[in-house]
Amino acid sequence: MLFRSPSFNDLYYQEVGNSKLKPENARQYNIGLTYSRNVCTFLPYLSATVDAYYNKVTDKIIAYPTKNLAVWSMRNLGSVEIKGIDATGSLSLQPWESIRINFSGNYTYQRALDVTTPDASSNKSTYKHQIAYTPRVSASGQAGIETPWIDLSYSFLFSGKRYALGQNIPENRLASYSDHSISAGRDFRIRKVTTSLSVEVLNLLDKNYEIVQFFPMPGRSVRATLKIRY
């Protein structure tokens, strides 16, 4: 049995806080398998992990949109059942001594259902519906190459469809989305000063998507970062 008290912000933060929040209680069951080894000089690192879990949560503390969708508030969700599978993997290749290629990724399938006893007086039951803003399927991945001259990387993030409110009905549905980014960076050392320069292209494909309903994310953008250490 796990116990989580609401934080100070959960209780009292302006407009968001809810001083009537109850502590969250959970029973968690988990089984997992991990494999990791150094295979050879060319494949110095290989790792894979699979976890399956089942959680039964009472008075789950969640952030929930109010009538004004720009303002969210904390609330308790009476009873939630969460079950799912997480899979992660990573490997490194070293074709030459000074060059390393890295890959990693993860996949999550999660059913997080509101199993609170339905209110007979309400015609808006959310019983056995996926809780708000929780996709059943999500994934991410990264690939990168490290060289003495420059470091290059690519990353992506995928989220399946979600629902903006507790009812899983078409008008509350948010479409799935994917986000891709690339970056390049290099370190320069002059005497005792190390300078790091990196350039990133975010939302590479310039996709229109929303993480929160009615709040579109920025389109393609470029960000440059310069760090000096001495």
Annotate each language-model stretch with its function.
Residues 25-29, 81-85, 99, 133-139, ...:
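Residues that define the transmembrane beta-barrel architecture of outer-membrane proteins
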Residues 17-23, 38-40, 73-79, 93, ...:
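Outer-membrane beta-barrel proteins
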Residues 45-56, 73-165, 194, 205:
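Gram-negative outer-membrane beta-barrel transporters
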Residues 30-34, 88, 218-230:
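Outer-membrane beta-barrel "beta-signal"
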Residues 178-199:
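C-terminal structured "cap/appendage" subdomains that terminate the fold
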Residues 201-203:
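Gly/Thr-rich phosphate-binding loop signature of adenosyl cofactor/nucleotide-binding cores
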Residues 24, 34-42, 90-96, 144-148, ...:
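Structural signature of outer-membrane beta-barrel channels/translocons
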Residues 1-30, 45-48, 52-76, 160-167, ...:
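Surface-exposed extracellular loop regions of Gram-negative outer-membrane beta-barrel proteins
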